Amino acid sequence: MHIKQTRKCVACRESKHQNEMLRISRVNNAFQLDITHKMGGRGAYVCKDKKCIDLTIKKRLFNKSFKSNLEENIYMLLEEYEKNN
């Protein structure tokens, strides 16, 4: 039996296949942008859609997901990704 790998976006709350999303991973209290979806640790997802990325950056939605304040560089990485794609 094949299991669908769907995840919920922190911004729009829609469930989509994880390949359509960006993942932020927390491993040993260090946060990283996980493009390959292969890092271990706790993760949270955002759609690759511009609106979702903008809302996530504006409202710092990953802080709520991880119940912790993320370093500013994570949100800067999201901005970079958005500009380049």
Predicted regions and their residues:
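C-terminal structural segments of small proteins and small subunits
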Residues: 54, 58-85
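Short linker/helix segments within small regulatory modules
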Residues: 27-42
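Arg/Lys-rich, often Gly-containing low-complexity segments of ribosomal proteins
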Residues: 17, 38-42, 46, 59-62
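Cys/His-coordinated zinc-binding microdomains
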Residues: 13, 48-53
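Residues immediately within or flanking Cys/His clusters that coordinate Zn2+
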Residues: 6-9, 44
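N-terminal cysteine/histidine-rich coordination modules
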Residues: 1-2, 8, 22
